[in-house]
Amino acid sequence: MKKITLTDKRKNNYYYNEAIKTLRTNIQLSGQSIKTILITSCFPNEGKSDVVLSLAQELGSIGKKVLLLDADIRKTAYVGRLGVEEEVRGLSQFLSGQANINDIIYETNFENMDIIFGGPSAPNPSGLLSENVFQVFLKKVREYYSYILIDTPPIGTVVDAAVIGRYCDGAVFLIEPGNVRYKDAQRALSQLERSGCQILGAVMNKIDTKADKYYSFYYIHYGEYYRRAEEENK
């Protein structure tokens, strides 16, 4: 396994960090069988990748071995986000037969956290993710990790998350209140449910914590989001 140094320049506030700890606790309380977790959102730019990275770091800090898998093989963001300047190989190259597993898993300088980058943009992402090779790959790597956190493209725009959901133990749905309509969230969640993946809960992101005007988030069961949204639409 290759080693790589990542740079995280984010400066998260107290409320954000506490929310991450709450999310981590809820993930752990979901049960020992929940290891492969898909994290998606309705639309782009809702802060999903920041939450995935923070959750991976938090789980690693308590001794859990974590694999962060960037499954957005349409438009990967982690290379630039984490200051990677060297050439790396990624998931799209593995799925297309251009690399093997050992070529794409990188040991990072973050405690107990490995990463797989998305790789170059693939011409047929949902097709590659539907292949048996991806399912076999997930079964193999889950033997070595406490948690596999899969960052997918937004399910409200492309079908990839629903395809990946067929092979996952659970899913977390990220929502930015005020910018995502209830009907859009309901439609996206319904598509994810049809994949057969258990929805563990929802993350309400970019919540204005009035105490310090920073953005934070909190974790709720997704059914609670439905109830609140319905009340707001009355």
Residue ranges, per PLM feature:
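Hydrophobic anchor at the start of a short beta-strand
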Residues: V66, I148, A171, I199-L200
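Helical hairpin unit composed of two closely spaced alpha helices linked by a short loop
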Residues: S61-L67
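Conserved nucleotide-binding/hydrolysis micro-motifs of P-loop NTPases
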Residues: I73-K75, N100, P120-P123, I155-G156, ...
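Conserved beta-strand segments of the P-loop GTPase G domain that flank and frequently precede/overlap
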Residues: L38-T40, F117-G118, I150-D151, F173-E176, ...
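P-loop/Walker-type NTP enzyme "switch/lid" segment
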Residues: K2-K21, T25-Q32, S41-E46, Q57, ...
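Hydrophobic positions on the alpha1 helix immediately C-terminal to the Walker A/P-loop
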Residues: D50-V51, L55
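Hydrophobic micro-sites
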Residues: K2-T5, Q186-K234
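Inter-motif core of Ras-like GTPase G domains
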Residues: K140-E143, I155-G178
